[in-house]
Amino acid sequence: LRTTGVSRLRPETDSDGKFVVVQESDVIRPHRVRVGLYKLDDDAGTGSAVVRRIHQVETDIDGERTEIPELAGIEHDLALVNDDDLTYCLMGLTPEHQQFALEHLGDIEDSLARTLVWSSLWESVRDGQLPAREFVRLVARFAPAETHPSVQERLLAQATQAVRQYVAPQWQGEGMDLL
């Protein structure tokens, strides 16, 4: 039986606005997910920018590619393909969404959505798609504002692991100083 491993779900859009959830795994499994689209609101009435969910769709992912017609053409800054954390998977981000997250992670209003983005970014470090130093800097910048102590604790542990195992030895001192 080939049943081990975790599915990776990631969004994909094309120039026509089509929105697809791509499943990457040795074994394709069914998943029930909520896909959430988020946008930066510069005029939130608070004097600072806030990233808010603007649309959400609950759907079944049952193949390598699942088109979500309800999300076609909706302008957004960030898409979470496992919004509300309904299924067990690794959640990927597009390069554009990852860059947005690196700049605005602390502005994401919903704490669960923020935690899901943190998890996705950590997996990107482990996969070699995000430099560990960038993750450490991100933790130093945004983790102190996290509202859940367990999230802060996990982020500090991950950033410490990144410094000890994933960065060049000559940067380890600077990395630990940031934390």
Residue ranges and their predicted role:
Residues 1-179:
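Non-catalytic accessory/interaction domains
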